[in-house]
Design a protein with these regions (language model features):
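Substrate-binding cleft of secreted/luminal carbohydrate-active enzymes
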Residues: 61, 65-72, 298-373
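Bacterial Sec-dependent N-terminal signal peptides
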Residues: 1-13
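Substrate-binding cleft of extracellular glycoside hydrolase catalytic domains
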Residues: 103-106, 112-236, 243, 247
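Alpha-helical scaffolding within the catalytic cores
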Residues: 52, 75-83, 112-116, 182, ...
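Aromatic- and acid-rich polysaccharide-binding/catalytic face
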Residues: 94-96, 259-281, 326-327
Length: 373
């Protein structure tokens, strides 16, 4: 792994940020607050802390890859604790999921107002990330789900309501976005940057290559009406969270597919990511090359994965992803006090995978991060 002295961690000298026009600007992390938006236009509406993290990711392209984990289902550090238990190192990134937002209550079994998780993590210089399995009422009205369809346990909610601000659907979406923003505001007040990946995997099986096939459909309701409704929803969410709620600490991650029709636009996206499951080296290479061709100047990441090539193989192949975040394994990490937690097996990234990763000079763990605040 890349070893940084305390002084190097504090300074991170000679940061180079690539502009979308191909030119560059150089500075160090401590100088980010003096860089103007004319120099790096996409940093408009970004807090100093978010700019520092963006600069760190941008400058690190081809040199380092941040390690990360997804919290086991919702709001914890169980996966990170499992990695530490078996390797002695904490990943750099811990990603929470607002999947149970509708059930959150003060002091309840899920309580997103509880600041202990993110405070403990970021006080040790860890990076917080967040996503949202955004559930809508099921057709039978008994619960909430992300899965579109006409069955009782699916949802017929249409994202096209985003085009009509007077509709009940629009108002419901705004209300739910506002709730997530409310839980994020304490992090913004504490100057904590957040890697934010909303509306993930929107394209699903929609594909420009295979139109009209029986599986040509979205996996989640926010993609069911196609790219136009998705892009509008993304832009409305961005405006609501950044301009209305003032969440300038967010770094926006777009979960890409093979069609550029779904891309919200450079001004709304900081990181372009893909989710790999049971993927070969040639498969990950294909997507890396696609990103380089279609998203020049962006940061490229692996936002979810399970059973993909080792980091040593990716790096040797010239695939310089900025961060990687394996998906959780509830059977392994759902209960830190269980016997299963002691096992080195994992459905998506076992300890052999982690040991290979931690041997690589490019991999960054939590203890090696600079201070972004």
């Amino acid at each position: 792994m890349l070893l940084l002295s305390q002084s190097a961690q504090a300074q991170v000298q000679n940061m180079i940020v690539h502009r979308t026009d191909g030119t560059k600007v150089m500075f160090n992390v401590e100088q980010v607050d003096s860089v103007t938006f004319e120099e790096v236009p996409r940093w408009a509406n970004r807090s100093v802390e978010a700019r520092k993290l963006l600069a760190y990711l941008d400058e690190g392209a081809g040199k380092r890859m941040l390690s990360g984990v997804h919290a086991c289902i919702n709001y914890n550090t169980y996966e990170a604790d499992w990695v530490y238990k078996h390797t002695g190192k904490y990943p750099a990134i811990n990603c929470i999921d607002f999947i149970h937002d509708i059930y959150s209550s003060k002091g309840g079994w899920i309580d997103y107002t509880n600041q202990t998780i993110w405070k403990n993590w970021t006080n040790k210089r860890g990076i917080m990330a967040a996503m949202w399995h955004w559930g809508m009422p099921t057709n039978d009205g008994t619960t909430y789900t992300c899965t579109p369809g006409t069955a009782d346990g699916e949802t017929s909610f249409s994202p096209s309501a985003i085009f009509d601000p007077t509709s009940d659907g629009y108002k419901m979406m705004i209300q739910r976005i506002d709730q997530i923003a409310t839980w994020m505001k304490p992090m913004a007040a504490a100057r904590v940057p957040i890697i934010w990946r909303p509306l993930h995997e929107a394209q699903g099986n929609w594909s420009d290559q295979y139109p009209g096939t029986s599986w040509h459909k979205a996996w989640f309701w926010w993609g069911i009406d196609g790219p136009e409704a998705f892009v509008e929803l993304w832009k409305v969410m961005y405006d609501r969270m950044v301009n209305y709620h003032g969440l300038t600490n967010l770094i926006w991650v777009y979960n890409a597919g093979d069609s550029m029709k779904w891309y919200p636009g450079d001004e709304y996206v900081d990181v372009v990511a893909f989710d790999f499951y049971n993927q070969s080296l040639s498969g990950t290479r294909q997507w890396y090359q696609f990103f380089k061709k279609n998203f020049p100047g962006k940061i490229y990441a692996i936002s979810e994965f399970g059973n993909m090539p080792k980091i040593s193989e990716l790096w040797a192949d010239g695939q310089y992803w900025s961060f990687m975040v394996p998906w959780w394994d509830n059977a392994r990490t759902g209960d830190p006090n269980s016997e299963a937690f002691n096992s080195t097996d994992h459905n998506n990234a076992n300890i052999d995978y982690w040991q290979d990763a931690l041997k690589q000079d490019c991999i960054i763990t939590r203890d090696e991060l600079p201070n972004f605040r």
